[in-house]
Amino acid sequence: MVCEMETDQIEEMDVEVLSSMWPEDVGTEADKQFNVEKPAGDLDTLKEVTIETRTIADMTRLPNLLNSTHQGSSQLTNLVKQWEYMQDNAVRLLKEELKNLDRQREEAEAKELKIIEEYKFESNEPENVPVLDETSDLFRRFRQKKRDALVDSKKIEIYEEFDTVAYWKQKALSLEKMLEASTERERRLMEKLSESLKTMESQSAPVQELTQNLKRAEGFLHFILQNAPIVMGHQDKDLRYLFIYNKYPSLREQDILGKTDVEIFHGGGVKESEDFKREVLEKGKASKREITFTTDLFGSKTFLIYVEPVYNKAGEKIGINYMGMEVTDQVVKREKMAKLREDNAVRKAMESELNKTIHITEETMRAKQMLATMSHEIRSPLSGVVGMAEILSTTKLDKEQRQLLNVMISSGDLVLQLINDILDLSKVESGVMRLEATKFRPREVVKHVLQTAAASLKKSLTLEGNIADDVPIEVVGDVLRIRQILTNLISNAIKFTHEGNVGIKLQVISEPSFVRDNALNADTEEHEQNGLTETSVWICCDVWDTGIGIPENALPCLFKKYMQASADHARKYGGTGLGLAICKQLVELMGGQLTVTSRVSEGSTFTFILPYKVGRSDDYSDDQDEFSDMADQQSEPDDTAEGYFQFKPLLGSIYSNGGPGISNDFLPHKVMLTSPIKLINGFVADPSNNTGQSEMLQLENGGYMDESKLETSSGHCPESAHQYENGNGRCFSKESESCSSSQASSEGGTLEMESELTVSSHREEEKAETEVKETSKPKILLVEDNKINIMVAKSMMKQLGHTMDIANNGVEAITAINSSSYDLVLMDVCMPVLDGLKATRLIRSYEETGNWNAAIEAGVDISTSENEQVCMRPTNRLPIIAMTANTLAESSEECYANGMDSFISKPVTLQKLRECLQQYLH
């Protein structure tokens, strides 16, 4: 029994020792961080220590924590306290476990010693030393203590059957097994403790890192708040300040807290700021806005304000957080940048417009160059044809030869007119054509156009001119283009009218409805120089006829290029269909309008309306002889205010195929003559049209001349080698006949010359005069590279009684002028080696300086041989006349700008050459 009780006590002691190793409050004290299952009963193993939850920092919430200093600090404090508590609790638990293990081991060793001691005591073998010699005293004390316990117990008797050696041996073996099991449990527990320590160390690293990040973020936040030039604050739902931070405070904190913006500040922008905050609070959505404040406290400044709503845990809005930053300088810079961008945009737009202008200018220049090239290439060979035909007309020809020659000249004139029409049309469409503004008299222009048309008239028509009294005596406009329009329209009217009347009517009208802002193209400065006022007038011009009329269905396409009323009209009357198209474009270019009304078999009326500037009534043109060729050199009544003209074909029988002569009823004691035209204001006829050539036939005294004046007029033509007499004894000069026949042939008729006058006495006189003049003939230099043009010029000069030297380019011309003295130079513009313009500049430089240094610098070799004589520096200006096939107005201006004195366009005619020689040699 005693042994049984001992066994039970030992087992209870083992359980008690094992149970004491695990305190009952482990789970609660560790805040349930560890779940340790305590051993109970005969459980020999210890379950693993596991971690239910791991505290890991949520990095996504870190920015939210930083938005509020109080929240971040609170979270950080709680986290640190929790971590410290966990660490302290773990250390305490480990210490307790180690303490329990040590106590358990000591108890196990004590039990083992007790058992051994009892075993030795029962076997009476005290001489045997225990396993642990050093603990012999402990065994003796334990044995004595055991005896005392047994004696003081309830005196339970020990049965002898259990007090045997075998029993105690078995008991020792069982205790040894228990000791091994306890040792194994201790080893496993130590391993678990080591693993737990390692796990705790690994778990503590994120907590330390999070703590470090939080401290760093907090330091960064403090750094921003201390250095950023911003204002931060928190306001409740009534927009009263609960917190504010300002780097540069202008008010004390106690003056702000508990108040609204309106209660604190006064001035512009305050109410807007409060309304903006209230709007954000109501909508519950963060927003930002620039607001300019104008207050007495800090003046006018612009702030960028960012406002966000604040919610509690229940999701209710409790106020707002806001941040404000001054952006006044940025706003100013932004406005400057916007202004700069606007200026850059304007500059780019101007550059774009400039590039467009440059492109248009280049296109215009190319168009001009094309027109100049086209004119030059066509007119150059045509000059040879027309010039040679004109020279041939001055020779003795029979009737058939003269008819053929007239057809040749007429065809050449038609080709030239066609070329002029095409060039005019091209110049208008390409924008090359420029209008001139000069003073002229409308009555004289109308009279001149009608006289010219009557001179070549072969039909029984009456030409009328009717100018209203309110038409000004003198106006300003492009007289050459107006004459061109009138000439084309009156020519068409005559062409399609077989009998009846053709006329021109002028009248002043009020400003028409189609007027545009840019209707007037005249230059204001030029008008002021001419003494004009700003008064303008609209003049309506009607060109009417009683001809065949135009079908109504043909009117819409009448002004289109290369279009005629019908194919039958084109075959019967000819023409290219360009005349009306050119007239319409010229009228529109001058700011007017051209219309037509017509009825078949009743006639047509072409009406164009143009604006004109009007001069003062007492400021007439200085040149009272603008159309002196229309009147006799003797004094005549002034007809500048005359308003009605009428011309009838008094020489109609000349153009009839079978008529023998001129009826005395039509031409009593009078005959029609030709004479050169003096153009308005001294202007040379525009080389781009054939106006000057088509108007070569002029009428003296309204188209007639007395017989007494005939011989005098004929005497002015020494170059005429022959004279012819008609049936009535009237005589024509050969040059006059040639010009008249040329005009008549353009209408399809030929002028019949009936007989030749023998004037031997006149020839002898002319021969004597020629011998006298040979000693004083002027020296003329022709600078031309085209052999055909040289041949034509020589022949014309021969007809005019002159000779000339030839130079093929500008270098040869300079060499010739250096070695000889000339009275006149006819200079071609386009030549190889050295063109006419540059040669003229070098000649003018020589006249100014007396040396050829400029020519030498240009590479011209002016060295002379010993036999050549060097001409002295001329005292007078050498006349240099340009001869070119370029018909652009810029070409003539360029010639004048380079020092030339006049301009002759090709094809050169005897009339043009004669006028030039008369102007510069007489």
From Swiss-Prot:
<dbReference type="InterPro" id="IPR036097">
    <property type="entry name" value="HisK_dim/P_sf"/>
</dbReference>
<dbReference type="InterPro" id="IPR001789">
    <property type="entry name" value="Sig_transdc_resp-reg_receiver"/>
</dbReference>
<dbReference type="GO" id="GO:0006952">
    <property type="term" value="P:defense response"/>
</dbReference>
<keyword id="KW-0175">Coiled coil</keyword>
<feature type="coiled-coil region">
    <location>
        <begin position="169"/>
        <end position="205"/>
    </location>
</feature>
<dbReference type="GO" id="GO:0090333">
    <property type="term" value="P:regulation of stomatal closure"/>
</dbReference>
<keyword id="KW-0418">Kinase</keyword>
<dbReference type="GO" id="GO:0046872">
    <property type="term" value="F:metal ion binding"/>
</dbReference>
<feature type="binding site">
    <location>
        <position position="785"/>
    </location>
    <ligand>
        <name>Mg(2+)</name>
    </ligand>
</feature>
<keyword id="KW-0217">Developmental protein</keyword>
<feature type="compositionally biased region" description="Low complexity">
    <location>
        <begin position="738"/>
        <end position="747"/>
    </location>
</feature>
<dbReference type="GO" id="GO:0071219">
    <property type="term" value="P:cellular response to molecule of bacterial origin"/>
</dbReference>
<dbReference type="GO" id="GO:0071732">
    <property type="term" value="P:cellular response to nitric oxide"/>
</dbReference>
<keyword id="KW-0808">Transferase</keyword>
<keyword id="KW-0597">Phosphoprotein</keyword>
<dbReference type="Pfam" id="PF00512">
    <property type="entry name" value="HisKA"/>
</dbReference>
<dbReference type="InterPro" id="IPR036890">
    <property type="entry name" value="HATPase_C_sf"/>
</dbReference>
<dbReference type="GO" id="GO:0000155">
    <property type="term" value="F:phosphorelay sensor kinase activity"/>
</dbReference>
<dbReference type="InterPro" id="IPR004358">
    <property type="entry name" value="Sig_transdc_His_kin-like_C"/>
</dbReference>
<dbReference type="Pfam" id="PF00072">
    <property type="entry name" value="Response_reg"/>
</dbReference>
<feature type="coiled-coil region">
    <location>
        <begin position="86"/>
        <end position="120"/>
    </location>
</feature>
<keyword id="KW-0460">Magnesium</keyword>
<dbReference type="GO" id="GO:0070301">
    <property type="term" value="P:cellular response to hydrogen peroxide"/>
</dbReference>
<dbReference type="GO" id="GO:0048364">
    <property type="term" value="P:root development"/>
</dbReference>
<dbReference type="InterPro" id="IPR003661">
    <property type="entry name" value="HisK_dim/P_dom"/>
</dbReference>
<dbReference type="GO" id="GO:0009873">
    <property type="term" value="P:ethylene-activated signaling pathway"/>
</dbReference>
<keyword id="KW-0611">Plant defense</keyword>
<keyword id="KW-0472">Membrane</keyword>
<feature type="binding site">
    <location>
        <position position="830"/>
    </location>
    <ligand>
        <name>Mg(2+)</name>
    </ligand>
</feature>
<feature type="region of interest" description="Disordered">
    <location>
        <begin position="620"/>
        <end position="639"/>
    </location>
</feature>
<dbReference type="Pfam" id="PF02518">
    <property type="entry name" value="HATPase_c"/>
</dbReference>
<feature type="modified residue" description="Phosphohistidine; by autocatalysis">
    <location>
        <position position="376"/>
    </location>
</feature>
<comment type="function">
    <text>Functions as a histidine kinase and transmits the stress signal to a downstream MAPK cascade. This protein undergoes an ATP-dependent autophosphorylation at a conserved histidine residue in the kinase core, and a phosphoryl group is then transferred to a conserved aspartate residue in the receiver domain. Negative regulator of the ETR1-dependent abscisic acid (ABA) and ethylene signaling pathway that inhibits the root elongation. Promotes stomatal closure.</text>
</comment>
<keyword id="KW-0938">Abscisic acid signaling pathway</keyword>
<dbReference type="GO" id="GO:0005737">
    <property type="term" value="C:cytoplasm"/>
</dbReference>
<dbReference type="GO" id="GO:0010105">
    <property type="term" value="P:negative regulation of ethylene-activated signaling pathway"/>
</dbReference>
<feature type="domain" description="Histidine kinase">
    <location>
        <begin position="373"/>
        <end position="614"/>
    </location>
</feature>
<feature type="domain" description="Response regulatory">
    <location>
        <begin position="779"/>
        <end position="921"/>
    </location>
</feature>
<keyword id="KW-1003">Cell membrane</keyword>
<feature type="binding site">
    <location>
        <position position="828"/>
    </location>
    <ligand>
        <name>Mg(2+)</name>
    </ligand>
</feature>
<dbReference type="InterPro" id="IPR005467">
    <property type="entry name" value="His_kinase_dom"/>
</dbReference>
<dbReference type="InterPro" id="IPR035965">
    <property type="entry name" value="PAS-like_dom_sf"/>
</dbReference>
